[in-house]
């Protein structure tokens, strides 16, 4: 069946194998991948299509199911990878900017407070969506304002950090959004001190996480009053595997694709861990990794 797509200035690509595009190297085919030229191009697409629209960023925290993704998958490209200083220790960044690049840019501007981002392998847009954080800091603590396009009506909105209603690994906005730009604010500091903190974050991550494996970051959010990895460990899940998927022995809140795992292997293993923790502690773990696609 032929589908009429809106006329855009960006790029449509078709039948994209997502296992070649995700950090976990799993997933079926996306029907249509769209990279908009700018915000206007993005809003034009959403307002003029009846197909379902999904959003991906760096694909560092997603499992795309083996069945793939139906409809249109939007990925912000280089046109949204800009960073600029506004003065007064403020930075404006597009939604496609890597969080690690934002941290280094801030350091070069002698702006402190964003160092924790250097160890998070995602984009500004994805980080805003999940209130990404590490080592006691999170996006909510440094973001000032956000521009977002609503996936239902296609309109552009701007929100303050307070209006986002941030909480641990999430926000309170209703509906589905794609975050296209954000303004961040830090504090002035000496470059050498910032550089040292950046190195400390990287070293801490390298020591505690399986950075050389095919992973998607932490599997589960930390439940209130608990650490997910401790619950997983005490539930006997360290090194557990299904097919080519394994729970990391270095950090048991990480899934590994260690031997040509399928998306089903990874998702089933995560759910097996959830069940084990529920049985042992009566605590319900919540996925931090996003799962895209239908069964």
From Swiss-Prot:
Location(s), subcellular: Cytoplasm
SUPFAM superfamilies: FAD-binding/transporter-associated domain-like, Uridine diphospho-N-Acetylenolpyruvylglucosamine reductase, MurB, C-terminal domain
Reaction catalyzed: UDP-N-acetyl-alpha-D-muramate + NADP(+) = UDP-N-acetyl-3-O-(1-carboxyvinyl)-alpha-D-glucosamine + NADPH + H(+)
EC number: 1.3.1.98
PROSITE patterns: FAD_PCMH
Active site residues per record: 169, 218 (proton donor), 288
InterPro entries named in the record: FAD-bd_PCMH, FAD-bd_PCMH-like_sf, FAD-bd_PCMH_sub1, FAD-bd_PCMH_sub2, MurB, MurB_C, MurB_C_sf, Oxid_FAD_bind_N
Any one of the GO BP annotations: cell division
Top-rank taxon, per record: Bacteria
MF annotations from Gene Ontology: FAD binding; UDP-N-acetylmuramate dehydrogenase activity
Keywords: Cell cycle, Cell division, Cell shape, Cell wall biogenesis/degradation, Cytoplasm, FAD, Flavoprotein, NADP, Oxidoreductase, Peptidoglycan synthesis
Cofactor: FAD
Pathway participation: Cell wall biogenesis; peptidoglycan biosynthesis
Gene Ontology CC annotations of this record: cytosol
Domain FAD-binding PCMH-type: 26-189
HAMAP family: MurB
Entry similarity comment: Belongs to the MurB family.
Protein's job: Cell wall formation.
NCBIfam families per the UniProt record, alphabetical: murB, PRK13905.1
Protein known as: UDP-N-acetylenolpyruvoylglucosamine reductase
Organism per entry: Wolbachia sp. subsp. Drosophila simulans (strain wRi)
């Amino acid at each position: 069946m032929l589908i009429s797509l809106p006329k855009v200035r960006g790029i449509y690509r078709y039948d994209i194998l997502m296992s070649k595009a995700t950090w976990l190297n799993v997933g079926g085919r996306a029907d249509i991948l769209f990279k908009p030229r700018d915000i206007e191009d993005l809003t034009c697409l959403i307002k003029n299509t009846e197909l379902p629209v999904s959003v991906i960023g760096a694909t560092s925290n997603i499992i795309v199911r083996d069945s793939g993704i139906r409809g249109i998958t939007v990925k912000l490209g280089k046109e949204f990878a800009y960073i600029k200083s506004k003065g007064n220790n403020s930075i404006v960044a597009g939604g496609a900017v890597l969080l690690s690049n934002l941290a280094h840019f801030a350091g070069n501007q002698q702006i402190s407070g964003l160092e924790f981002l250097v160890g998070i392998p995602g984009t500004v847009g994805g980080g805003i969506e999940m209130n990404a954080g590490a080592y006691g800091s999170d996006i909510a603590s440094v973001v000032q304002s956000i521009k977002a396009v609503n996936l239902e009506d296609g309109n552009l909105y701007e929100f303050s950090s307070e209006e986002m209603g941030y909480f641990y690994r999430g926000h309170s906005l209703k509906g589905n959004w794609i975050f296209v730009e954000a303004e961040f604010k830090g504090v002035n500091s000496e470059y050498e001190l910032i550089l040292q903190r950046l190195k400390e974050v990287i070293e801490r991550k390298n020591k505690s996480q399986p950075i050389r494996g095919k992973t998607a970051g932490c599997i589960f959010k930390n439940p209130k009053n608990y650490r997910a990895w401790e619950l997983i460990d005490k539930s006997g899940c360290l090194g557990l595997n299904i097919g080519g998927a394994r729970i990391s022995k270095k950090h048991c809140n990480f899934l590994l694709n260690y031997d040509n795992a399928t998306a089903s292997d990874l998702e089933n293993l995560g759910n097996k861990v959830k069940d084990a923790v529920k049985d042992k502690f009566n605590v319900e773990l919540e996925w931090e990794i996003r799962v895209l696609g239908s069964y």
